[in-house]
């Protein structure tokens, strides 16, 4: 494998990491709060608001139901408005983030719903406000599983970023399609697959270790 190809793979890996990291950060900033809101506004919870809960739930379900490749194409005008372009790694971060937010929100919602409601009632009996319950009870109790959720999200975003290469998103997916598929260079196709597998394994190992460490605390 020539030095040019190695440099190409390094650039593609860095582009994939950029798309994944940016999208993960944005998804955490918006998806985790959305997941919390979906829980606390549900019927019988600390900030019950059934109407808001149903609206947010419908939006989340609608977004999650659209396959990623279709979502990328459908929001090209919005991507161009936000990123100034519809191709490249920066542009790919927009649909990746939009796909990631509802995905993480549902995972976080499930994690928080698994918390024993007796813990919440105990905090309420001691006079804790809804905000205090969220920050000091719900999030700490659900933290290990939220870390697992973020790990699952990152693994999905790595695969989504590879799909983004199909329509000019850059990264390893773009390299695999342009060189491995269109030019029949099997060595490059295999190399991109190996790199993607290594990235996923590393993310899973780190996420599992972090979750176990937080669980012990």
Residue ranges, per PLM feature:
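Residue-level recognition of membrane-helix boundary sites in multi-pass small-molecule transporters
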Residues: 90-91, 119, 130-132, 143-144, ...
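Membrane-water interface segments at the C-terminal ends of transmembrane alpha-helices
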Residues: 8-113, 148-155, 195-203
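Transmembrane alpha-helices
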Residues: 130-161
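Short helix-to-coil transition segments within interhelical loops
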Residues: 112-142, 182
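Short membrane-interfacial helix/loop motifs at transmembrane-helix boundaries
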Residues: 1-7, 167
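C-terminal transmembrane helix and the adjacent membrane-cytosol boundary/short C-terminal tail
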Residues: 37-43, 125, 189-217
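Non-cytoplasmic
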Residues: 78, 149-198, 208
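Helix-capping/transition residues at the boundaries of transmembrane alpha-helices
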Residues: 63, 80, 123-125, 152-155, ...
